[in-house]
C-alpha cells in the first residue's frame, strides 16, 4: 500500500504520526516521527537525506544565459505523497509560514551550536 515507505525500511507505515521536511545546503532532509509506544520517553524518529536535483534553466534566449536551479528529488516527492495520505497534514496559512521559518531558524541555531560543541570537544581530546 505504501511501497516507497516500505522501500525506506518502514515496515509499519500506520505507526507514523508526522514528518518534517527542511533544506540543508544541496540536500532535503526528511524526518519521520512515529507514534510514541508505551513505556518510551520520546517518540522514535528516522531521518533521510535526499540530494537535490540540479538543472540548468535558460534565463535569456538572446544571450543564451543559463541559471543553475535545484529542485526536489523525484523519489522524495513520491515518499511525501505517501506520508500525506497517512498524516493528512493541514495546509499552512501565511502566518504559519512565518512561524515555520522562525522554527527552522531556531533549529539551525541548535544544530550549529551542537556542531561547534562537538568540534571543540574533539579539539580538547587532541590536547
Swiss-Prot record:
Coiled coil: none annotated. Pfam families: DUF3461. NCBIfam families: PRK13677.1 (NF010213). Belongs to the UPF0325 family. This is UPF0325 protein VC_2264.
Amino acid at each position: 500500500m505504501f511501497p516507497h515507505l516500505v522501500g525506506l525500511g518502514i515496515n509499519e507505515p500506520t505507526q507514523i504520526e508526522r514528518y518534517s521536511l527542511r533544506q540543508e545546503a544541496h540536500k532535503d532532509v526528511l524526518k519521520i516521527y512515529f507514534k510514541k509506544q508505551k513505556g518510551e520517553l520520546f517518540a522514535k524518529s528516522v531521518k533521510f537525506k535526499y540530494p537535490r536535483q540540479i538543472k540548468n534553466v535558460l534565463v535569456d534566449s538572446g544571450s543564451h544565459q543559463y541559471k543553475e536551479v535545484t529542485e526536489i528529488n523525484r523519489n522524495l516527492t513520491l515518499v511525501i505523497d505517501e506520508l500525506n495520505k497517512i498524516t493528512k497534514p493541514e495546509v499552512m496559512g501565511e502566518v504559519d509560514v512565518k512561524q515555520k521559518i522562525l522554527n527552522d531558524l531556531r533549529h539551525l541555531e541548535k544544530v550549529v551550536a551542537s556542531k561547534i560543541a562537538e568540534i571543540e570537544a574533539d579539539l580538547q581530546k587532541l590536547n
